[in-house]
Amino acid sequence: MPTEWLVGTALAAFAAALAISAVLTPAVRKLALRIGAVDVPNRRKVHTTIMPRLGGLAVYVAFVSVVLPLFLWVYRIAPGTEEGNLFAALLTGGTLIALLGALDDRFDLPAGLKFVVQLAVACLVVFGFDVRIEFVNIPFGSAMQPVGEWLGVPLTIFWIVGVTNAINLIDGLDGLAAGVSGISLATILVMAALMGNETMVLMAAVLIGAVAGFLIFNFHPARIFMGDSGALFLGFTLAMLSLHEFKQITVVSFVTPLLIIGVPLSDTFFAIVRRVVNKRPIFAPDKGHLHHCLQQLGFSHRKTVLIIYGIAAFFGVCAVVQSLISKSGVGTWVTFIVICVIMFLLQIGAELIGLVHRTRRPVLDFLARLRMKLSAASRPK
């Protein structure tokens, strides 16, 4: 496909999805209020008035309305191919996940039921559409090895369910989940363009447009929440797109999708650690997420969201740079160093803002003791 055609098609698809989403969102808002799909404030939430949710319905409809004609009649994706399977899995699984989220927005479904349905959808994707991780690389080597179903299947299911829920966990401030998802999708689009993956470029462009149209009404002060219908749908599509882009996993390449979705995944990881440390159920909600900690430090609602946007953009840039250097001979070693540095910075940041515990700061305490010892050793005797 000529570059000019791809760019023009991607821009047109983006604009169409944005327009449809922007037009549908006010209508969805009225529908949510009419049927009682609302979010009632409580001590854990930052909003103080009843807010309509179900906003993800506008994102879903905008995405499907553009991507269906685009890939069936314009791009003419072939059924039965790898791209065709991805397309079918994305639409089928995405529809089921969006329906699950919409029902939860209205009826507040039990967490266990939602998890079981997500697991079933992930299994449908893996076994019904043959979308799975297939190869792995020996660490610091170059030989690709097939992983077999015993590893590829559970790893794929874990990835889909994990990322689907990770986006939902950060949906705590106006525009946060939508904006972070948009940044992650933009990263996928850039990397797909660099790799020459036209299908991924177009899919990402459509979804970015759908998210952007909704974000007009969701950024602070929000007039509607995306709800689980949006958070779960965006999480599922991000999992699918990143999984397709990096199906052949190496020590280098598997870091890339982790970086692309770095903010929700790291926040989810620290949430699990925090609840284990504090001896609370893993699925129990709390006010210890990244956005809560930043607000407790004195940042306003809008500034907190923009700071997290910046962190998400940083992860995105790291993903692109890491992907580019991985093609060189030193890529594995550079990636290993990058992983260590990012993990160290994440731990320092988590301890500084109390993301895990208010008083337990092992790395900061170690650095303080080390500084004291070095200072004492440098004094003249």
Please place each PLM-identified region on the residue numbering.
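Extracellular/periplasmic helix-loop-helix junctions in multi-pass membrane proteins
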Residues: 319-337
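Membrane-interface capping segments at transmembrane-helix boundaries
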Residues: 27-30, 346-363
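N-terminal hydrophobic signal/anchor transmembrane helix of membrane proteins
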Residues: 244-250, 336-354
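Cytosolic, membrane-interface loops and tails of multi-pass inner-membrane proteins
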Residues: 27-52, 270-302, 370, 374
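Short, highly charged, low-complexity non-transmembrane loops/tails of multi-pass membrane proteins
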Residues: 356-378
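"…together with the soluble PPM/PP2C metallo-phosphatase catalytic core" -> "…together
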Residues: 2-268
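Alpha-helical transmembrane segments of integral membrane proteins
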Residues: 296-314, 320-323
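Hydrophobic transmembrane alpha-helical segments of multi-pass transport and channel proteins
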Residues: 261-269, 317, 344-348
